[in-house]
Amino acid sequence: MAVALLDDWCKGMDLDPKKAVLIVGIPVQYTEAAINDALKEGLPPLCAYKVIGRMFRREDEAKAVLIELPEVVDYTMMPTHIPAEGGAWEVVVKPRSPDDEFMNKLIYFLRDEGRRIVDVAKALGFSTVPTGKIELKNLDQDKPKGLKSLCNNSTCYKKLKVFSGSPFPGPGEESFETWLEEVTELMQLWQVSEREKKQCLLESLRGSALSIMQALWTSNDSLTVEQCLKALKHIFGNKEDSKVLQFRFLQSSQKPAEKVSDYLLRLEPLLQKAVQQSPLSAHSADSIRLKHVLSQVSMTTGLRGKLSLLDQQGCPPTFLELMKLTRDEEEWESTVVVEEQEQVRRDSSACEAANEVVTQAEDSREVSTQTTGEEMTSVKRRRLLWRHSAGEEGQRKESGFWAESEPDEQKPYVRAQESGNERGAWAVSHPNPKEIEAQDSQEFLPVAGNRDTLTKSWGSPDKGTGDMSVAEGQQGQGKAPNFLLARNDPNKQEQIPHSSVTTKWQDRGECQRLKWGASMITRPQGNPDRSWDTSGSQDGEDGCSELRMPTGTEAAQGVEEPATGLSWAEDTSAWEQARLGRETVPRRGGRRIQPVFRIIYTALGEPHEGSTLESFRE
C-alpha cells in the first residue's frame, strides 16, 4: 500500500518515483519543525532533500511525508527506518528493477568504449532500419534520463584524460606527450562529427591549455581538431633541436640478446622524431632506416643478404615491410633451432643406448671372465689333486706295496723314463740319436745267463735288487746279477727296484734270449714262427742284441691272451721273473723307432709333453 501511495503521489506531483522517498508512521502530534529535525538526524548527511508535502493516513492513524531527492535513490546509503520518539518511522522507496541496473551498466560500458546505441543495433542485425526509426521499448518516465539522452542524442564517447598545460602535472593530470598520444589515437577512431570532437577536446583541457584553445577558436572558427593539436604541440611540445634528435637516432644500438624486430620497434620513434624536425621525405626515412639497420644490427646471413640486395637496388622497404621480413626470418631461425635441439636429443638418446649396450657387454664379459677364472681354478685344482694322487701312487710303487699285494697280471706297468722326456724338455736342444740309442742299449740291456741261473738267483718277483756294482760282482762270480733300471740323468742316478718294473711280452709265437757277450741264442721249442727280429744292434755294445716286439695283428692278439703254442710251460714262471728286469725297444720292420717329442697345448692350462712311444707301450 505504501509503494502504491508513492507512485500515485509522484504522478500527481510530476515527480520521478526513483528520486522520491515516502516516510510513513509519523505521530500526529509532530509539528513540521520536529519532523525536519528528525529527518536531518535520520537521513545520510550528504543527502540533499526537499519536503514536497504532508498528509494524514486513516489506515495508520499517522502522518506521511513525501521527500524529493536531486539524484536517484542510492539503495546502499538509504536507511529503512528513522529513529524518533514514540517509535521508528518507515522509509518507503521505489523497488529496484533488474532492467534498470542492466541499462545503467550498458550506458557506462558504451561510454567507455566510445560506442553508441546505434552501433549496438547494427551489431544485432538492425542495420537496414533507419536510425531515426529505432525505438526502444518502454521508453516512458520510469527509464533513466541518461538513457533517454543517449537514445535521442547519438553522441557517446570515452572521457579523455586531462591536460592543464602546467610543466608539473597535478593529481589526475597527464603530461603533454601522454595526453597528445591518447587524444590523437581516439580522434582517429571516433566516428562522430567535427563539432563533437571539438567539444570532447575542450572538456579534456584545463588552465592555460583551455584558454589558448578558446582563443584559437574565437579567432578562427573553421579550425579542425588536427590543426588545434598541431598548435598545442608547437606551444607545449618538446623544444629539442633536430640535431639532438638525429644524434639520438644515430647513437641507438642493439642490446645484447635483443631480437631485430624488437630493436626496430624501439628505433622507429627516434627516427620519426628526427624526420619531423628535418625536411626529409618518407623515402629518405626508409633509406636511412635500412642503412642504419645494416650497419648497427647483428642478424643472420640470409636476412643480411636480402637487405643488402634491396639497398643495392635502391628499393628500401617501408617499416611494415621490414618488420614482416624480419619476423619471417626469426620464425625460420627458431624452427631450425628447434630441429637442431631435437636432433641433439635423438643423438644423445642413441649414445645412451650405445653406452647401455657397452655396459651390458662389459658386465657379461666380467661374468664370463669370472666363470673362466673359476674353471681355470677347478682345472688347476683337479690337476693338483691328480698330481698328488699320482705322487702317492708312485711312492707306493717304489715301496713295492703294489708289487707285493697284486698278482703279476694286475700289476701296473712302469717304464723307465728316457733322457729329456720330462717337463721342460721342449726347451732343450735334441741330442744325437746315436747317443740316445747307445744309452738305451746300456739302460735296458737284459741280464746275462740262462733260465736256470736266473731262476735260482731271483727266486721270486718280490726280491729286491742291489746297486750296479753288486750286479757286476755277481756276474763275475757266475751268478745272475739283479737287473737295475737306471734313469738317465747326468746329475743323479736313480735306481728303481725290479719289483716295481713290469714288462709285457708277446706270448704268441717264440721268445729268444741272448747271453751277455757270447751272443748265445736260446729258442724255445714250438712253432718256428719268425715274428721276432734276431738281428743284433749295431749301435749298442758288442755282443748285445735287441728284442723286437710284434706289431699289428700279432700285438693286438697277444696283449691279454696267453700263448697257446708255448713249449716250455714248466719254465714260464722263471721266465716271467727274468722279464721283470728287461725293457723292450719297439721296432717296426728293421728300423728302430726313435721317440718323437711333441708339446700338447691344453686350453686354459700348461703345456704337456707326449711321446709316440705311448701308443706302443699301451
Curated annotation (Swiss-Prot):
Superkingdom as given in the UniProt entry: Eukaryota
One Pfam family cited in the UniProt record for this chain: PNMA
GO BP of this protein: meiosis I
Protein name: Paraneoplastic antigen-like protein 5
Alphabetical list of PANTHER family matching this protein: PARANEOPLASTIC ANTIGEN, PARANEOPLASTIC ANTIGEN-LIKE PROTEIN 5
Coiled coil: none
Protein family: Belongs to the PNMA family.
Expression sites by tissue: Restricted to testis, where expression is low. Not detected in the brain.
Segments of skewed composition (Basic and acidic residues): 390-399
Protein location: Nucleus
Keywords, comma-separated and alphabetical: Nucleus
Region annotated Disordered, chain positions: 390-409, 451-475, 519-549
UniProt main location, coarse: nucleus
InterPro entries xrefs: PNMA, PNMA_C, PNMA_N
GO cellular component: cell cortex; meiotic spindle; nucleus
